[in-house]
Amino acid sequence: MRYEHLKTDYYNFGTHEDEVCRDYGDWFPTASLSMPLGNVQLSLSYRRDIERPNYSNLSSYTVYINRYTYQSGNPYLKPMYIHSLVLNCAYKWMNMTVNYSRINDAPTMSTEPYPGYDDPLVSLIRPINTRDDYNQLLLHIALRPVIGCWHPYWSAYVIFRDYKSPCADGSTITLNHPYASFAWQNDIELPRHWRLSLMAQWLPKGDTNNFRITRSVFNSFVGVQRDISLRSLGSLTADLRCYDPFETAKDEGIIFGIRELTSKNPARRTFMLNLTWKFNEARSKYRGSGAGEKQKARM
């Protein structure tokens, strides 16, 4: 059992606004049970958790996107509460998870007419809380064997939701098409500290919150990494990757809300070089960890 208390004061140009201020005191119970069944490890757990909005999403500051679109935060945004019941099953390099969640006040991006504008084409995008709570069921399976220098990773998951969203005509739509992902990643250890990475992922049509995917997507990347020893200075890792080499990651969808938007993103072949310098890997100096990590992450 965990208790959290958080108090936030909100000022608008120096004026204290009681309606936007927050004072939360919440209990977060957890319970878990685990047991072996032969060579299979089973666990069942329940927990209640909270996800507070990022501070940027609580700002009333408005950003210009283009002549028809503005974006802002929402100081009235409330945190999201999640009740989760998780069954996990593990056997050697295989893992299966079944996760049922009841989600309250989930945040979503809403597109609305811009207040004060006569042009009906001008829109304001801002985060809001969903009007209706919804259920979510996640089924996930992962296989991670080791075959010599080859480290394959197969994963598949499907998510079922009964998410409700308002429509432009004033009606309500239930977005309950399953959202799925099938991925195959390969890491191959090569001589002289070289590594080769290959990944392919298929995303079929489906619904994720208020976004309906109307076109299947195929993602892939190929990469090569090299570890370089810098002796007393640590080590340097060079990671060169090509994302979407076949330019197949085209996605299309519909964003439901007070205003409905059609989204189309073309495929783009992208190259990325990442250099990572690691030093003090032995952690000889105490770096500590604070109790405010979640609050810092919200920034």
Where are these regions (language model features)?
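Surface-exposed extracellular loop regions of Gram-negative outer-membrane beta-barrel proteins
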Residues: M1-P36, A156-F160, S181-G206
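Transmembrane beta-strands of outer-membrane beta-barrel pores
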Residues: Y3-D9, M35-N39, Y46-R52, T62, ...
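Outer-membrane beta-barrel translocator domains and adjoining extracellular loop/strand segments
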Residues: D9-E17, Y55-V63, Y68-Q71, R102, ...
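Outer-membrane beta-barrel signature, preferentially recognizing the C-terminal barrel domain
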Residues: E19-C21, I50-N104, S123-L138, P266-R269
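Residues on the lipid-exposed face of transmembrane beta-strands in outer-membrane beta-barrel proteins
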Residues: A31-M35, L44, L85-Y91, L139-P145, ...
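Outer membrane beta-barrel strand-and-loop segments of large Gram-negative receptors
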Residues: K78, N95-S155, F160-Q185
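C-terminal beta-barrel architecture of Gram-negative outer-membrane proteins
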Residues: V158, Y163, F182-S232, R241, ...
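C-terminal beta-signal and adjacent terminal beta-strands/loops
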Residues: I228-M299
